[in-house]
Amino acid sequence: MSWIERILNKSNITQTRKASIPEGVWTKCDSCGQVLYRAELERNLEVCPKCDHHMRMSARARLHMLLDAGSEVELGSELEPKDILKFRDSKKYKDRISAAQKDTGEKDALVAMKGTLQGMPIVAASFEFAFMGGSMASVVGARFVRAVEQALEDNCPLVCFSSSGGARMQEALMSLMQMAKTSAALAKMQERGLPYISVLTDPTMGGVSASLAMLGDINIAEPKALIGFAGPRVIEQTVREKLPPGFQRSEFLIEKGAIDIIVRRPVMRQTLASILSKLTHQPQPSVVESKADTVAQPENQADV
């Protein structure tokens, strides 16, 4: 074998090894651009270990992070969306539903569960942004109301993680009706004196921000989450003025009094447990180790 053939053979081996690396092993941070090992990022609860950027997280991952292992019982899992209006834009609505269900593994954009948080019974709900932008439609409203009813039945708090672009246009008036429906359900919790904690994540916009997301007894936000009704570009085009830096971000809103506290994801679980123990007049629960307790954080980074 000549020296040229030996070099060519080595090159072919290298190319074969590169091609054998499975997809999805590495990902890039949306903020700093750092290439991250996917498994490490999942252990860090989708928080970049380099710049602390909070990436978007699936609904089930959030609920798994919050609730005690083995305590989760899903609510309203039998509810599925229907194309009652036979709506069509560039695609049929039923085709969009099928594609979203295939991509996410969820039937719709909200997952609700009951369980315990460090031994305290709670009900929790979380939006799935990957399902049609977390848009609120009939099934989302029905599942949220189911979660409220379960909290009323169990006489326990409700926690909701919002991540949504707003009402789902394909369901027209029926999606807008969910704003009133969910707000009316939360009024029953207020009458009973049961705590409702709203956690606003990136992004929380439109009809969701104008209803259930901002009705918490305590409104918590993750760092740098986009929160508002209309998007910044729409507002700039309407008022024809440049918006201030950080407009509609968590840090801007807390300065204006629109939210109560900003909490980093690694300490979200313990913070919620502490708040709920005070609101329900229960003893401070003992700390139960979870994924959130072992997350790496950048140097000089405050927890809350």
From Swiss-Prot:
Pathway of action: Lipid metabolism; malonyl-CoA biosynthesis; malonyl-CoA from acetyl-CoA: step 1/1
Name of the encoding gene: accD
Protein name: Acetyl-coenzyme A carboxylase carboxyl transferase subunit beta
Location (main, coarse): cytoplasm
Compartments where located: Cytoplasm
Cofactor: Zn(2+)
Gene3D superfamilies, sorted: 2-enoyl-CoA Hydratase, Chain A, domain 1
One of the record's GO molecular function terms: acetyl-CoA carboxylase activity
GO biological process assignments: fatty acid biosynthetic process; malonyl-CoA biosynthetic process
Keywords: ATP-binding, Cytoplasm, Fatty acid biosynthesis, Fatty acid metabolism, Lipid biosynthesis, Lipid metabolism, Metal-binding, Nucleotide-binding, Transferase, Zinc, Zinc-finger
Residue ranges of every copy of the CoA carboxyltransferase N-terminal domain listed in the record: 25-294
Zinc finger (C4-type): 29-51
